[in-house]
Regions:
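Helix-coil boundary/capping segments in enzymes
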Residues: 2-275
């Protein structure tokens, strides 16, 4: 789980139409998380990165392949690293057309700067997740490309991930035979807890696992895995110790309320086990 960064915003310009250059310089990006350009994340340390992660040649942490190789890939004997770009990548954008352009540019950038230069790295297909049809087209565009290992979604979205607005994404992923990674965090515009915004960074971090449980429950109960039986999901950076108890509780409630979800042919725990 590696988060590559751009040294500058202009680094994406070779893969963006000129209209988006001026748009970004004039208006920036606007996620569903309020009308703000910066990410809705605690600002204690840029990019949630260590201070010694700044590349010696300058730029943001995670923006230098050579420094990543020296500091992380080589000393830790990394055999395979999955790139999961976060931030202003097109996910959670209010302007869906801009989101699609950014996502496509990020995907080309991953190949040009990272995977083509180090075979230990594989990219994730970034998509404009709130526009399911356009996102599915981007996934199909990358079909058969060995640079990509998975599609990429985030756990906090406008709606829970099982909602039908996201189904075209799952259909495309199943079609090309790639799993979909669901990385913690996102730009859905909703509070990160079920009862509002918390006070502390600790609560933010604990909330990742809670949000992934919501996402997984939605995927199961909305019937995503029943509709797409060959789809596989990867829940990223939110732990997994909660999975057995979640599966048990879903089964317990399902035994009493299964008439509400007749589209499910098996127990929730079985879908979780198989997908």
């Amino acid at each position: 789980d590696i988060h590559p960064e751009r040294a500058t915003r202009e680094e994406l310009y070779p893969w963006l139409a000129r209209r988006w250059h001026s748009h970004l310089e004039t208006y920036g990006v606007h996620a569903y998380q309020g009308m703000m350009e910066g990410p809705p994340y605690p600002k204690a340390q840029p990019n949630a990165s260590r201070r010694d992660a700044y590349p010696p040649e300058g730029g943001r942490q995670g923006s230098s392949l050579s420094f990543m190789q020296k500091q992380h890939l080589d000393p830790n004997n990394v055999v395979l690293g999955i790139l999961n770009p976060l931030g202003a990548t097109g996910q959670g954008q209010r302007n869906h057309e801009l989101g699609a352009a950014l996502a496509s540019a990020i995907n080309d950038w991953q190949i040009e700067k990272w995977t083509s230069k180090d075979k230990r790295l594989k990219a994730s297909i970034v998509v404009a997740n709130e526009d399911g049809v356009t996102a599915a087209a981007e996934i199909r565009k990358r079909a058969g490309d060995p640079n990509f290992a998975q599609g990429l979604l985030l756990s906090r979205n406008v709606e829970p991930l099982g909602q039908r607005r996201y189904w075209p994404i799952y259909e495309a992923a199943q079609e090309i035979g790639l799993p979909v990674g669901v990385h913690a965090f996102g730009f859905g515009g909703n509070p990160i807890t079920a009862s509002g915004w918390p006070s502390y960074y600790i609560e933010e971090m604990v909330g990742h696992s809670q949000c992934q449980q919501t996402a997984l429950s939605s995927l199961v109960l909305e019937g995503v895995f029943e509709r797409f039986p060959k789809l596989n999901m990867v829940m990223v950076e939110a732990g997994f110790g909660w999975a057995p108890s979640l599966a048990w509780r879903l089964d317990k409630v399902f035994d009493r309320l299964r008439s509400e979800v007749p589209h499910l042919k098996r127990k929730p725990s079985e879908y979780i086990r198989d997908h």
